[in-house]
Each structure stands twice: as C-alpha cells, then as structure tokens.
C-alpha cells in the first residue's frame, strides 16, 4: 500500500492526464492500468531544427527537435491469473522516475502506458509516437511490428535478448547487448592483453556441448587466429585436476583461462583451479561473462585472486554518486530498494528520450551519434545496413587483488 501511494505521489510531480479510467496498484494482488495512461513530464524548452541529407538523394529531410517527446510503454502489467509481475512494475517505476528527471532537466515527455494483457487494441495509441518501449518478449514484439509494417514507428526491445533476431528485418532497437557482442568484446580484451610468453587455455567439461556464449568465444578466437591449449575433464575428477592446470600453464607468462561450459558447478571448479595456480608459482587470469558472479556458492575472494576479467550487460557501481542519488530517490518515492529491472526501466527510457531530444525526429538514423552511460547499462550503436539497431555497449569489470573492482 505504501508503494501505491508512492507511485501516485510521483505522478503528482508531473502533469497527468488520462482519457479513461486509471488503476495503479503496485504490490502483490495489485492491478495495473486497464486502459490508456498518459504521464507528461511537463517542462517547456526551446526547440531547433537541423537538416540531414540522405546519401544519393538531393532532397533534404528535416530532423526537427520536437517540443514534446511521445513515448509508448507497453508492458504485461497484469498476468492472466489476475496478479502482477513485480519485476515489470519495478521496470515501470524506474521509467516513471526517468520521466520525472527528464522533465526537471527540460525535456518534455508524454509517456503512454499500455497493459499488453488487457486485450485492448494499441494501434491508435501508437500513432504519432517517437518510439514504443516494449512489448517485453520477442514473440510479442514480432506480432506488434507485423501490425505496424506500414507505419514509421520504432519498437525498443528493453529486456529480451532473443529480439536481436528481429533487427535484420524490422524497425527494432535491441537494447540488451547480445551474447555475440559480449563474446567479441571479451576476445578483444584478451587479445589486447596477450603477450608472447602468455598462454590461452580453454577448459571444457567432458561430454558437454558448449553453450551459445562459449561457441561465440571459440569462434572469435579462431577468427582472429589466436591459438589456445585445451583441457577437458569431468567434474568428478576435480580432485585430480589441479596438476593438469599446472602442466598446461605458462611458466614465464600468464595463463589466460576461459571456461567453455554452461555448468555452474564446473565453472566454479575452473575458478577455484585458476586461483590455485598462484600457489604453484604460476599466474592465471580468468575471462568470463557476468553469469559467473550469479552462481551460488561462488567465493568472491576467488574472483579477485584470479584477477577475473568479466564482460557484463548490466552492472551497478554503488560507489557512484549518480547511483546513490537514484537509490535514495527511489527509496523515498517507492519505499523499497530498486532491483535491476528498476535500473533498466530508468536507463532505457532516459536514453531513448535523450536521443530524440538531441537528434530530432530522425533520431533512429542518427543513433550512432549519441552514446550514453546509464545507471547499469551502456548504450552504443554503430552504423548498420539492416532495418534495426543493436546495442554494442558492454561493461568490462576487473576484479583486482585488493578486492576493488575496476570498470573499463
């Protein structure tokens, strides 16, 4: 109930209008909006226009900075059993806070919120929007983009990595960085640190097929011609394995280790063995993605002892002043701690609205010109020949021996 009043209080901080009955009851057994909801971050600013000239076309098309940014937020706020998804409400609350902050900074935002489980049609509300954030699943996005084939509206995929498959054919902006991009970033990183006396060691579990991320890393290593040794064993042999790591390790350089496995217990064992190399007068560094830190039973000290290099889609640096500000404001408004969905809701809305405000109505064509480091995500887009755009932003984390974490 406290969170209910907090959201209503937040809505009083921005101009609010609605064309139909509105219900906002966050929390368990709460109901979401049943019809259109419009939240307006109502701060006026001056506008200006710029011109861009498409290649091969003599007609100049204006990219005008709009007076008001129209955003539709399409979320399944009510599930089919009549309850709600708390994580998606956290995403929604983060987006509301972003709209509030944007309004205070001089960017006027109209935020239309739609419950995709309401059964109501959405096409009329999408008209005139600069972007649609959602739907959540790649399947729902495919249905929506198919409905809007004849329109110029852009869909922003905020959470589902599988929506990357839609980018080649549809007007979709993929904000979660794909595994292939994370793998390329990790191999780029390894390659930049690799010295002649070093050795790359790929460790895998007997009888296991590599997962998607591992396949991408192995493909990148082969593509770049980076040679590597392999070590394959079964987790049941773990007690006999440390000496095999020593045998494969570089004597004078650093052994750079990658675990090509989706098994949590096996990856944990690889981390333990890389950590043990230092007691055998060898130096080892582990390269991985952020899945490793979520494994139950992982000892954080081992991540630091192994001087782990980790690529991450999402990472929150709680020592950052802007994170502290967000957390305190979120606590004050919603009487709870923000989770990763709240950070993502804030980041996605803030980035898209800021891009429109800076790049104008042709923002999607000029997206590579604007990058942003959000609370937990980075947004970097490059020029692409396909229909949509894919975020290339990846955070690189170094677990230092002094138990600090550096972000690159």
Please give the residue ranges for each predicted region.
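Extracytosolic ligand-binding ectodomains
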Residues: 2-8, 20-408
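N-terminal signal peptide c-region/cleavage motif recognized by signal peptidases
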Residues: 15-17
């Amino acid at each position: 109930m406290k969170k209910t009043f907090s959201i209503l209080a937040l809505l009083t901080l921005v101009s609010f209008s609605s064309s139909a009955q509105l219900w906002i009851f966050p929390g368990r057994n709460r109901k979401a909006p049943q019809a259109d909801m419009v939240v307006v971050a109502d701060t006026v600013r001056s506008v200006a226009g710029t011109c861009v000239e498409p290649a091969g076309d003599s007609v100049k098309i204006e990219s005008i900075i709009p007076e008001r940014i129209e955003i539709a937020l399409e979320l399944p706020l009510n599930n089919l059993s009549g309850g709600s998804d708390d994580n998606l409400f956290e995403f929604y609350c983060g987006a509301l806070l972003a709209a509030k902050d944007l309004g205070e900074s001089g960017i006027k935002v109209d935020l239309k919120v739609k419950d995709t489980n309401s059964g109501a049609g959405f096409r009329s509300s999408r008209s005139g929007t600069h972007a649609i954030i959602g739907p959540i699943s790649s399947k729902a996005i495919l249905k929506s983009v198919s409905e809007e084939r004849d329109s110029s509206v852009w869909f922003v995929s905020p959470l589902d990595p599988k929506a990357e498959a839609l980018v080649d054919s549809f007007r979709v902006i993929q904000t979660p960085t794909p595994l292939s991009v994370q793998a390329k970033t990790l191999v780029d990183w390894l390659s930049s640190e690799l010295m002649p006396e070093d050795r790359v060691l790929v460790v895998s579990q007997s009888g296991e097929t590599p997962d998607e991320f591992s396949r991408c890393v192995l493909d990148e290593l082969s593509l770049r011609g980076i040679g590597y040794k392999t070590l394959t064993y079964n987790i049941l042999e773990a007690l006999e394995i440390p000496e095999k790591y020593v045998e494969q390790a570089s004597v004078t350089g650093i052994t750079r280790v990658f675990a090509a496995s989706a098994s949590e217990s096996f990856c944990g064992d690889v981390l333990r063995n890389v950590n043990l190399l230092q007691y055998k007068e060898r130096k080892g560094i582990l390269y991985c993605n952020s899945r490793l830190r979520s494994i139950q039973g992982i000892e954080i000290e081992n991540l630091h002892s192994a001087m782990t290099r980790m690529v991450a889609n999402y990472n929150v640096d709680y020592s950052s002043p802007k994170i502290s500000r967000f957390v305190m404001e979120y606590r004050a408004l919603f009487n709870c701690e923000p989770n990763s969905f709240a950070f993502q809701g804030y980041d996605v809305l803030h980035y898209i609205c800021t891009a429109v405000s800076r790049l104008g109505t042709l923002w999607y064509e000029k997206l590579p010109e604007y990058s942003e480091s959000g609370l937990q995500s980075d947004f970097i887009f490059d020029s692409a020949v396909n229909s949509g755009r894919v975020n290339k932003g990846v955070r690189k984390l170094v677990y230092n021996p002094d138990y600090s974490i550096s972000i690159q």
